[in-house]
Amino acid sequence: MRTRLDHVGVNVRDLAAQTAWYTKAFGLTSVFEFHLEGPGLSGIVLAHPHGWRIELLARPGSAPGLRAPDPLTAALTEGYGHFAVTTPELAPVYQALVAHGAGEAVPPGPSPEPGIRMAWVTDPEGNLIELIEKNAE
């Protein structure tokens, strides 16, 4: 089966604020925006220069979902828990995201997977983001 992950969708409370944060923190650019009048759903697809994309969705009357402070707590709830990005330089990326307002969930350290280092942050609304450095020494 020939498939490829296209994007990750994140439901947000404040579309404008989250768009500004993801754009600034990750260097993303807008691909397209949309609004569905009937349900009042608004969204934007943002792209990274390396090809990954994220879709931010907002709808009036939404309620907060999973807001776990770390990945171990998130694993107590079934369903979507986080998205992950890779980087060749874990510590500087972690620090840059924190400097842009990311919450510190798990500082850089070894992953359970051999040769991998990881860290976790949260976006301004508390959504978990995993950072992965492969082939770490």
Functional labels for PLM-detected ranges:
Residues 52, 60-63, 137:
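Active-site/binding-pocket entry motifs
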Residues 14-15, 88-90:
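Helix N-cap motif at beta-to-alpha junctions
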Residues 56, 73-76:
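Helix-adjacent hinge/juxtasegments
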Residues 32, 68-74:
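Short, P/G- and charge-enriched loop/turn segments at secondary-structure junctions
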